[in-house]
């Protein structure tokens, strides 16, 4: 799992897990990303390990819509000639309230594994990464529209945050 280096400073057992379960830290330094980070990825992939990167850079809690993707993960995949396993996470609200957050219902997550995206060896890493990123985004949009039965648009509605007990989300 590629994680921001700040996650290594989490309290207690989380810090231990983040440090010792084979995570690859991501440090916001051009020098690190250009020199050390690719070596960490290469080493992991050479040992037949999978690498998990969230290409949208950050997760928004319970946000249902696919986010615009960032090209970095696709660039490294293209550069190392490895596929992208595309996924879409469906979020469904449950009837029970969150224990510590009464403004939210509990939710469940369903991971949909979409068709794998392979690099095109005839393209350079830059063009390949753009093509892979676009294919992945289109797969995520298609999954969203099929699962939720609605066309994707980015106008915000309270429904976009799964489980939110906003008045607009409550039954009439």
At which residue positions do the language-model features occur?
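Catalytic core of membrane glycerolipid acyltransferases/transacylases, capturing the structured
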Residues: 1-31
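Non-catalytic C-terminal accessory region of glycerolipid acyltransferases
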Residues: 35-172
């Amino acid at each position: 799992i590629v994680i921001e280096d700040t996650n290594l400073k989490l309290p207690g057992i989380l810090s231990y897990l983040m440090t010792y379960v084979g995570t690859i830290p991501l440090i916001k330094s051009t020098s690190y990303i250009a020199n050390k980070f690719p070596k960490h990825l290469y080493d992991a992939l050479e040992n037949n390990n999978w690498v998990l990167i969230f290409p949208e850079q950050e997760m928004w809690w319970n946000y249902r819509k696919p986010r615009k993707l960032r090209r970095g993960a696709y660039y490294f995949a293209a550069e190392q000639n490895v596929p992208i396993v595309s996924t879409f996470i469906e979020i469904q609200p449950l009837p029970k309230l969150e224990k510590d957050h009464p403004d939210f219902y509990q939710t469940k997550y369903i991971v949909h594994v979409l068709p794998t995206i392979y690099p095109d060896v005839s393209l350079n890493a830059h063009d390949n990464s753009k093509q892979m990123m676009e294919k992945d985004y289109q797969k995520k949009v298609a999954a969203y529209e099929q699962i939720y039965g609605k066309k994707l648009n980015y106008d915000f509605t309270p429904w976009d945050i799964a489980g939110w007990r906003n008045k607009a989300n409550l039954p009439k």
